[in-house]
């Protein structure tokens, strides 16, 4: 239980975004978390029952996706993010626009190294009725090297290191409250989520997948996730996360022109301990019980 509480605390900030993005890669969910945390039902599932044909198509997709994920050892890509909430503006037709837009880079190395860095962003200013650019050094930025998580907290001018307990190293990213994201294993996904293929009839080059949480531990983080995979190679194109209790949502899109699979990463340089910026304070935190 201590491991779950620790990861839940960390994931509520930095690694939560990482988990939502690396849904597309095949790390397993330890049985311990499933037994300890995913026992309380989230309520009646909203997903409709599937026909035998629909169930067979879903099963085929999940098995193929798991096999594809298992082959990926490193990945890097440019991402774009749009955030929609109650403060979002609307266009002339009443369609809600993004409250904020951002772009950055994501890097991953199996089984537990990751980097997430927002490099540019802009946010809606309701008084000016325009999008204001935000400072370049204000975006979310963190690095996980498998033994520690380094998080830049720009508003506090801090670089924080959170050391992971030894028993969690090598699998730390996968041991959070969202095994769906890091555990693209067919059996795990079916146990924890109500899933169905929702690809529009007019779309032929993508596969759209919807997932609804079956348990409260997952429903606390999202009410629904929609994934878009490229049909040619089952690599990620976009992910849309609907927040609990409302219409707020985050949309991520991954630029296929910048996607590098199993090449282009320096495992030492890309995931090493970051330098503390001038004027920042370095703070080291120990994991509970370590």
Sequence positions of predicted segments:
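N-terminal secretory signal peptides that target proteins for export/translocation
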Residues: 1-15
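A mature extracytoplasmic/lumenal domain signature
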Residues: 79-83, 110-112, 120-122, 148, ...
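N-terminal mature ectodomain segment of secretory-pathway/periplasmic proteins
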Residues: 56-151, 155
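Non-transmembrane domains of secretory- and envelope-associated proteins
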Residues: 35-49, 155, 203, 215-224, ...
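A mid-sequence, solvent-exposed acidic-amphipathic segment
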Residues: 189-224
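Acidic/charged, solvent-exposed loop-and-adjacent secondary-structure segments enriched in E/D, K/R, S/T
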Residues: 150-180
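Bacterial N-terminal signal peptides
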Residues: 14-31
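Short, hydrophobic/aromatic-rich segments at coil-to-beta transitions
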Residues: 71-78, 111-117, 203-212, 233-240
């Amino acid at each position: 239980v201590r491991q779950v509480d620790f990861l839940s605390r960390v994931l509520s900030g930095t690694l939560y975004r990482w988990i939502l993005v690396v849904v597309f890669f095949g790390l397993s969910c330890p049985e311990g978390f499933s037994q300890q945390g995913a026992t309380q039902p989230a309520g009646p599932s909203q997903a409709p029952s599937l026909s035998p044909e629909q169930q067979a198509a879903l099963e085929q997709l999940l098995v193929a996706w798991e096999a594809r994920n298992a082959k990926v050892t490193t990945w890097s890509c440019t991402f774009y993010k749009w955030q929609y909430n109650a403060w979002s503006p609307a266009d002339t037709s009443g369609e809600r626009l993004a409250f904020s837009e951002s772009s950055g880079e994501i890097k991953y190395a199996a089984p537990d190294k990751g980097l997430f860095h927002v490099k540019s962003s802009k946010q809606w200013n309701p008084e000016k009725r325009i999008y204001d650019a935000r400072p370049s050094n204000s975006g979310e930025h963190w690095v996980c090297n498998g033994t520690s998580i380094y998080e830049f907290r720009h508003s506090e001018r801090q670089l924080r290191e959170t050391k992971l307990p030894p028993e969690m190293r090598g699998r730390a990213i996968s041991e959070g409250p969202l095994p769906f994201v890091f555990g693209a294993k067919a059996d795990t996904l079916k146990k924890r989520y109500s899933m169905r293929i929702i690809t529009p009839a007019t779309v032929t080059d993508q596969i759209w997948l919807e997932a609804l949480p079956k348990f409260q531990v997952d429903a606390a983080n999202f009410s629904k996730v929609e994934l878009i995979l490229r049909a040619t190679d089952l690599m990620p194109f976009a992910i849309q996360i609907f927040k609990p209790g409302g219409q707020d949502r985050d949309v991520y899109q991954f630029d296929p022109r910048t996607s590098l699979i199993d090449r282009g990463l320096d495992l030492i340089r890309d995931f090493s301990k970051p330098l503390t910026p001038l004027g920042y304070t370095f703070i080291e935190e120990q994991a509970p019980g370590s």
